[in-house]
A protein has these predicted regions:
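Eukaryote-biased recognition of intrinsically disordered, low-complexity regulatory segments
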Residues: 1-22
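Short, contiguous acidic and Ser/Thr-rich linear segments
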Residues: 20-32
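Short strand-turn-strand beta-turns centered on an Asx-Gly dipeptide
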Residues: 26, 65-68
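Ferredoxin-type iron-sulfur electron-transfer modules in oxidoreductases and energy-metabolism complexes
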Residues: 30-43, 88-233
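Active-site phosphate-binding and catalytic loops of NTP-dependent enzymes
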Residues: 45-51
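DNA-contacting interfaces and partner/effector-binding or oligomerization modules
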Residues: 51, 61-66
Length: 233
């Protein structure tokens, strides 16, 4: 297949503003968009900058805006993308260079929700904290998050309010709020009940469409909201 790949480029050392550059490529229908980016970097322009790691949809490193939607470049097939493909950096986060964005703010919000198991008490049998299949199911969906930022950077509330904690942080808070073994339930709900927490969600559902892991992000936000209301009585 002959492919026309348009990439929004930006070099802070040379450019005043981002601009589009077009590359002619030949690819197989089964190739991924990441393969096209590799072609450009390896054979046409070694200055092209982007982030990637596992190339198997597990690490979340190569999330970017492809044909107008947030996707993982390593998962999106050329046959689905078409012969004219546009690629640009994620929205709402600072652009470092080309397709590379600054994830520090995103990760700060993630860390702020205490995304780890807090369980200081001694288990009943002194060995393990048992959990039934039903208890595990409560957070099964949100445990799939790979921190690609596709959901958060697809959110129009996040675009206009950088203080909003964002869908990804709420998803990871949900994962531990719903965990029967965790003992920081109230602390996380207090964080989520902040003015820039769950109440900022406007149920646009962009986050659900963007998630490459199929997480129902909006439902997770609703469930955290319900927990806050239940706690308040």
């Amino acid at each position: 297949m002959d492919i026309e790949l348009r990439i929004k480029r930006f070099n802070p050392e040379a450019d005043d503003a981002p601009h589009w550059e077009t590359y002619a490529l030949v690819a197989e229908p089964s190739d991924r968009v990441l393969d096209l980016l590799h072609q450009v970097k390896w054979y046409q322009d070694g200055t092209l900058t982007f982030r990637r790691s596992c190339a198997h949809g597990v690490c979340g490193s190569d999330a970017m805006l492809i044909n107008g939607r947030n996707r993982l470049a390593c998962e999106y097939l050329v046959r689905d993308a078409g012969t004219r493909i546009s690629v640009e950096a994620l929205k709402g986060v600072p652009m470092v260079k080309d397709l590379l964005v600054d994830m520090d703010g995103f990760m700060d919000k993630y860390r702020a929700v205490m995304p780890f198991l807090v369980s200081d008490s001694v288990p009943d049998d002194g060995k393990e904290r048992r959990q039934s299949p039903a208890e595990r199911q409560r957070y099964d969906d949100t445990s799939k998050c790979i921190l690609c930022a596709a959901c958060t950077t697809a959110c129009p509330v996040f675009w206009t309010n950088p203080d909003y904690v964002g869908p990804a942080a709420i998803v990871n808070a949900h994962r531990f709020i719903m965990d029967s073994r965790d003992e920081a339930h109230e602390e996380r709900l207090e964080i989520m009940a902040d003015a820039d927490g769950v109440w900022r969600c406007r149920t646009v559902f962009n986050c659900v469409e963007a998630c490459p892991r199929g997480i129902n992000v909006t439902r997770a936000i609703f469930e955290v909201t319900a927990e806050i209301e239940r706690q308040r009585g």
